[in-house]
């Protein structure tokens, strides 16, 4: 009986330690990691570091998302491409899986679309709207249980970082 309790506490403690390692990165941490420019669809665009967010999963793998200046892109690209997503771990968005790598993303018409760096769509999932949010910001991650929300203003998608 005592052995079972000890084992149970070790399992609970191990789970808590793993969760404690997962965190949203601070602004200073993001500044050290974020690129100053991002290559997408044949061009490099300036990264809006102030509108870049990141997280670290329990294994220490980093995910960065940031907005870019799309003024040099064609209208067709600029309409759907708003930012970059760099991930060292597999991500899941509403059943759609994204392997480690570098991507473009955009929120448009109730959808969150992820594209490869050649601007080909990889997947689109429905985005949600958080009307209760008092002070929306251009881009941020927020913890949501064991997952995260990636916000662009009031629009968001839920993402799980493995």
How would you name each of these model-derived features?
Residues 22-76, 124-162:
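Primarily secretory-pathway and cell-envelope proteins
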Residues 1-10:
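Bacterial N-terminal signal peptides that target proteins for export
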Residues 16-22:
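Sec/Tat signal peptide C-region and signal peptidase I cleavage site
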Residues 111-112, 116-119, 131-132, 140-141:
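Short, charged/polar low-complexity linear motifs in solvent-exposed/disordered segments
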Residues 10-11, 16:
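Detector for intrinsically disordered, low-structure N-terminal pre-sequences
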Residues 72-118:
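Mid-length scaffold segments of soluble, non-membrane domains
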């Amino acid at each position: 009986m005592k052995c079972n309790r000890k084992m149970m506490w070790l399992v609970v403690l191990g789970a808590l330690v793993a969760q404690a390692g997962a965190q949203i990165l601070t602004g200073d941490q993001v500044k050290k990691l974020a690129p100053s420019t991002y290559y997408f669809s044949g061009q490099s665009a300036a990264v809006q570091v102030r509108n870049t967010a990141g997280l670290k999963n329990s294994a220490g793998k980093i995910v960065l998302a940031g907005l870019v200046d799309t003024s040099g892109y064609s209208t067709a690209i600029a309409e759907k491409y708003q930012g970059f997503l760099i991930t060292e771990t597999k991500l899941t968005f509403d059943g759609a899986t994204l392997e480690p790598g570098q991507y473009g993303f955009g929120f448009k018409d109730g959808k969150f679309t992820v594209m490869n760096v050649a601007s080909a769509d990889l997947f689109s999932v429905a985005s949600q709207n958080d009307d209760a949010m008092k002070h929306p910001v251009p881009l941020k991650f927020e913890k949501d249980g064991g997952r995260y929300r990636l916000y662009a203003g009031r629009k968001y998608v839920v993402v799980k970082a493995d």
